[in-house]
């Protein structure tokens, strides 16, 4: 596996490749990331991964400086997955001058849910993903359903900007107790880690309520929020949305069997966790 930081060297290395499968990450790789590499291999060859902790998608009071950086461990894991190239640019490589041009998603998708609580987050994501796509020029790219809203925004962005990249969705990988794998799980104390699976259990309860015939979605959401708060969480949202566009479903959508998803974000101690479950 070649480890490359220069954009020009990356382009030289990939010249002539027209079936590249790309997996962008921020590093601190876990089994969820590695499952993305394996899925990428099913859809293209060679597989290219990137590791870049993107300052543009962190808010002023978020964990950019604390975000775990484990490049050497990550390299060893990617070598075992037979990744062809790891693109690991420095901040100077990606942003040699102030990034004045930004890619901003539409407000109806980028300013809800995560976008409401993390202003500018999806503009940072879209900007860096567009730039990475321009560098790698993949045929397919793999994104996890764990970041459901991000997946939808990136997919729509590629469609609307006519980027010739097929976005492949990967299922969320979970620990045996149900907790979705995340690089931020390492922030959890032992007691918090024992409590953390309750987030996925709460989503499962929401799904059961909807599938069981309850139609007052606001009441279901409020019940879930209260349940988490009573256990010491600080939830930002528990929200049932249409999978197609993340708009809140009407009664007609529910009766018609519209595919839904419930999404949540909540703080446990100092650690903010997100998760979702399709209904």
From Swiss-Prot:
The active site is at 33 (proton donor). Keywords: ATP-binding, Cytoplasm, Ligase, Nucleotide-binding, Pantothenate biosynthesis. GO terms for cellular component: cytosol. It catalyses: (R)-pantoate + beta-alanine + ATP = (R)-pantothenate + AMP + diphosphate + H(+). Its main location: cytoplasm. The keyword Metal-binding does not apply. Pathway: Cofactor biosynthesis; (R)-pantothenate biosynthesis; (R)-pantothenate from (R)-pantoate and beta-alanine: step 1/1. (R)-pantoate binds at residues 57, 150. Its EC number is 6.3.2.1. It holds the Pfam family Pantoate_ligase. The reaction proceeds by a bi uni uni bi ping pong mechanism. Catalyzes the condensation of pantoate with beta-alanine in an ATP-dependent reaction via a pantoyl-adenylate intermediate. NCBIfam families: cyt_tran_rel, panC. Belongs to the pantothenate synthetase family. This is Pantothenate synthetase. It comes from Burkholderia mallei (strain ATCC 23344).
């Amino acid at each position: 596996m070649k480890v490359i930081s220069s954009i020009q060297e990356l382009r030289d290395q990939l010249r002539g490749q027209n079936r590249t499968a790309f997996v962008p990450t921020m590093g601190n790789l876990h089994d969820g990331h590695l499952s993305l590499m394996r899925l990428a291999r099913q859809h293209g060859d060679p597989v290219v991964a990137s590791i870049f902790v993107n300052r543009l998608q962190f808010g002023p009071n978020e964990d950019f400086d604390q975000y775990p950086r484990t490049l050497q461990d990550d390299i060893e894991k990617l070598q075992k997955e037979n990744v062809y190239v790891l693109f690991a640019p420095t901040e100077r490589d990606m942003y040699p001058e102030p990034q004045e041009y930004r890619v901003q998603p539409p407000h109806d998708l980028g300013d809800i849910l995560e976008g409401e609580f993390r202003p500018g987050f999806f503009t940072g994501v879209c900007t860096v993903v567009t730039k990475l796509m321009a560098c790698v020029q993949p045929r397919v790219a793999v994104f996890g359903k764990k970041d459901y809203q991000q997946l939808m925004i990136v997919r729509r962005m590629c469609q609307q900007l006519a980027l010739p990249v097929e976005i492949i969705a990967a299922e969320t990988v979970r620990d045996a107790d149900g907790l979705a794998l995340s690089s931020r799980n390492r922030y959890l104390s032992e007691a918090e880690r024992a409590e953390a699976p309750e987030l996925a259990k709460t989503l499962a309860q929401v799904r059961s309520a909807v599938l069981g015939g309850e139609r007052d979605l606001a009441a279901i959401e409020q019940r879930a929020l209260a349940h988490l708060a009573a256990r010491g969480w600080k939830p930002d949202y528990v929200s049932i949305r249409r999978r197609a566009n993340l708009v809140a479903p009407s009664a007609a959508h529910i009766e018609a069997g519209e595919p839904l998803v419930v999404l949540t974000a909540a703080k446990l101690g100092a650690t903010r966790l997100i998760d979702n479950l399709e209904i």
